[in-house]
Amino acid sequence: KGAAVMPHALINNVKLKLGEKGELLKEYVQWLSQRVQKLRNDENYMPVFHIDVYGTIGAIFGVDNYPAMADYLAELEEAAKPFHLRIEGPMDAEEREKQMLCLKGLREEVDRRGINVELVADEWCNTLEDVKYFADNKAGHMAQIKTPDLGGINNIVEAVLYCKEKGFGAYQGGTCNETDRSAQVCVNCAMATKPDQILAKPGMGVDEGYMIVYNEMERILALRKARK
């Protein structure tokens, strides 16, 4: 299908998914890189690896232990090569201000050391106000804009545009537990505002969400062409 961003596994358990020293996720990223290189039909196909870790990296290294977390992110960067890596929710500091400070601190450490891994704000970044707060403080490199949490398409649009204005990555996300209609509405918002990426939804089987979202994109383009 040539998806621009690879769907991620659920890295939501230290013992079973991340590994006590992060070894399981590292092995998974290496496997994913090797598999894409083996199966792709075109060497120019370079998808982004976007992996939500549900705060587990902070759980093993410490939510504000930036040097240790950055060391591990550098290992993941190497494992993902030649593909670009995004890590969503590296830590969960259990309250909004501390989460912002931790993501800001980790971004500064990663950027200072030239580690080519993007950090995506997830935990404690839910409402339009939250998105602006994280973007203003450069807490991470990108925000997941959780479409159901924002309360209206006006807020979804404003959140994406605000992130772009601030030079902060905009990931128009949401949840797999949505409907085909909400996904179609979100696609229209995304086609208008141009976030960096959009979640293929609903469902966790990949194909159904990808088809619903991609078909709506094609429908918008076809209608636009017909009206010219």
Placement of each model-derived feature along the sequence:
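Catalytic core of soluble alpha/beta enzymes
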Residues: A4-M6, N13-A192, Q197-E216
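C-terminal extensions of enzymes
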Residues: V213-K228
